[in-house]
Regions:
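Membrane-proximal intracellular helices of multi-pass ion channels
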Residues: 1-435
């Protein structure tokens, strides 16, 4: 077994064992207000640990405070990454971090060099906890007057952690629909989602950089693409839904909720409107945003905005017949271009196959609704068109598999189980293919 496969196997073992432990805790009677099947407990644990947000039951009425704390911890560990939490524990105990463990972080976060790995996870932990604390304080302004100090504090903490880690779990029966007119909740959660979705690397780079022109290429690409997608998504959602799901709202409220849904759709999965009632055209737009997802080195899922941006720039440059693929006066390497194209293709193929299988198992459900659920699970978003309560046992197992694949990454899984070929010392002559 080569040096790449050993960390991958260990990472997957940590990942699956944590999910199983979480499921067992949620299944036990002392964490719930009423009995729950183990499959539903496994589904919720998987959804929390992959920071997706899908749930076959209302977690607010299903679980007591202990169960909600278990879900909260799964979200936090899943957002930071189980490997990151493990190594942070070793750092806290003043234990030496071996090269094997450093390589494990590199594999987990797709980092090319081992240098600065410990500094990276320290910054990640501090950034996450500080941002979540600030978000909690802001949400307290709305929740404490409504629920009192004790419950208000916990709701603020849970919602802040869920938002920053792009999980989309809420302890309210209708998610955030009842708070669609509350500016404190909508704005705070939107900011938390954005900060969680762009990653700490970009934020630290932005803070340390005195001029925007001096930002790293990664930060420029993440910030630019994120801004464009949020604006386009908000405008499109407003135009498509202003006379549908938002017809009862005023103009300012429509704009605010359009912005919120554009932000949350790519990564988090909170909803301030009824997703089951949106137009088909809106559903297609939301699926595209969920497929793209957030930034690398963050809690967000999807193919990642940098992958989308690089592929888009490559196609644009190819149409223009430009020899080099470049952006912001920097050339993009062939390695990253190939990786982006491969990621998009295998993700599209995976989603298509899973949707095809689910359409056979659930012949009475429309294809667009099934596709929406699969894309949401794969992008670890958590938006649902209210189909989740209708899932059969086999459908739940498939969706769990999709969530895990979306969180771990298809390429990571394929590299784990498909051994690499030895490099060849020769090359074949080029052949002609007509396209």
């Amino acid at each position: 077994m080569n040096k790449v496969h050993k960390p991958l196997y260990f990472y997957l073992m940590l990942f699956f064992s944590t999910t199983i432990i979480g499921a067992l805790l949620l299944y036990l009677p002392f964490t719930g207000k009423k009995p729950i099947s183990f499959l539903d407990a496994l589904f919720i644990a998987s959804s929390a640990f992959t920071v997706t947000g899908l749930s076959p039951v209302d977690i607010g009425s299903q679980f007591n405070i202990l169960g909600e704390i278990v879900i909260l911890l799964l979200i936090q560990i899943g957002g930071l990454g189980i490997v990151t939490v493990t190594l942070l524990t070793l750092v806290f105990l003043n234990r030496k971090i071996s090269m094997k463990n450093r390589f494990l972080i590199m594999v987990t976060w797709n980092i090319d060099e081992p240098g600065g790995v410990i500094k990276l996870i320290k910054h990640l932990a501090i950034y996450s906890l500080v941002t979540e604390l600030i978000g909690m304080i802001c949400l307290c302004l709305s929740f404490i007057p409504k629920f009192g100090i004790g419950k208000g504090l916990f709701l603020s903490l849970f919602t802040s952690v869920s938002a920053f880690n792009n999980a989309g779990f809420a302890l309210f029966k209708n998610n955030l629909i009842d708070y669609s007119s509350d500016p404190i909740v909508i704005i705070t959660i939107s900011i938390l989602i954005i900060f969680g979705g762009i990653g700490h690397f970009v934020v630290i780079d932005f803070i340390n950089c005195k001029k925007l022109s001096k930002l790293s290429l990664h930060s420029k690409l993440v910030l630019t693409t994120t801004s464009i997608l949020i604006i386009i998504g908000a405008i499109t959602f407003f135009l498509l839904e202003q006379f549908n799901t938002m017809q009862h709202m005023g103009l300012v409220e429509k704009i605010g909720n359009s912005f919120f849904q554009s932000v949350t759709t790519r990564t988090a999965g909170f909803n301030s409107i009824d997703i089951a009632s949106i137009n088909k055209s809106t559903a297609l737009m939301l699926m595209l945003l969920m497929f793209i997802g957030g930034a690398p080195l963050s809690a967000a899922g999807g193919i990642k905005i940098t992958t989308f941006a690089v592929a888009f720039i490559f196609v644009l440059n190819y149409i223009r017949k430009e020899n080099n693929v470049s952006v912001f006066n920097k050339e993009i390497s062939d390695k990253h271009i190939k990786l982006s194209i491969v990621t998009i293709n295998i993700s599209f193929l995976f989603i298509s196959i899973i949707t095809f299988i689910l359409s056979i198992i659930n012949p009475n459900i429309s294809l667009i609704k099934l596709l929406f659920e699969v894309v949401s699970a794969f992008g670890t978003v958590g938006l649902s068109m209210n189909l989740i309560t209708e899932y059969h046992g086999i459908t739940k197992i498939i969706i769990i598999f999709v969530m895990l694949c979306g969180k771990v990454g298809l390429l990571t899984l394929l590299r784990t189980f498909i051994p690499p070929k030895s490099p060849k010392n020769y090359r074949y002559t080029k052949g002609q293919i007509y396209l």
